[in-house]
């Protein structure tokens, strides 16, 4: 997103990652809100409140999620209604969840791809903004297919975010449609 010239105001991650380093190198605010509790008693609402607080402090308008590994609670979507964008390595609604590429291969699909969508409290279930397909090659394994999808996903995500910035909104209300 940095290389595409998108205005990145803040990078937040739930674990140490390259994105935090890139932000720091470019003088962009970066926050690690690490999830340390992986027990069944994990307080998702408390964690989400922390994320929403950080985003609010930085006056964030649109949240572009990429690789954020913690499912966030309802307060995220209340604070940013229809303004949390996510990417997924499958053609939703097919193969939602963490193992989309593996699931697509196991099912035997001949075509898969990626989806850019509005995130909601239900994982991988929001309105679809963009999709792009790619064939599954005979010699593909999970790694090779996922790499090809990620290449498409990065480009499509940037194009979708640029379109959102150009239009000034994520989803059109009936009076905004062209």
What are these regions (language model features)?
Residues 1-178:
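One-carbon transfer enzymes
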């Amino acid at each position: 997103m940095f290389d595409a010239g998108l205005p990145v105001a803040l990078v937040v991650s739930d674990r140490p990652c390259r994105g935090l380093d890139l932000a720091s190198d470019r003088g962009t605010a970066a926050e690690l809100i690490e999830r340390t509790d992986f027990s069944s008693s994990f307080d998702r609402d408390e964690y989400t409140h922390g994320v929403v607080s950080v985003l609010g402090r930085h006056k964030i308008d649109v949240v572009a999620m990429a690789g954020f590994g913690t499912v966030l609670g309802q307060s995220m979507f209340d604070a940013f209604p229809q303004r949390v964008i996510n990417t997924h390595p499958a053609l939703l609604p097919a193969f939602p969840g963490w193992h989309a590429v593996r699931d697509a291969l196991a099912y035997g699909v001949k075509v898969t791809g990626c989806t850019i969508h509005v995130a909601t409290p239900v994982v991988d279930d929001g309105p679809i903004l963009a999709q792009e397909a790619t064939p599954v090659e005979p010699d593909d394994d999970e790694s090779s297919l996922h790499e090809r999808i990620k290449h498409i996903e990065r480009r499509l995500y940037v194009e979708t975010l640029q379109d959102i910035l150009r239009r000034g909104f994520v989803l059109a209300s009936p009076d905004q449609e062209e």
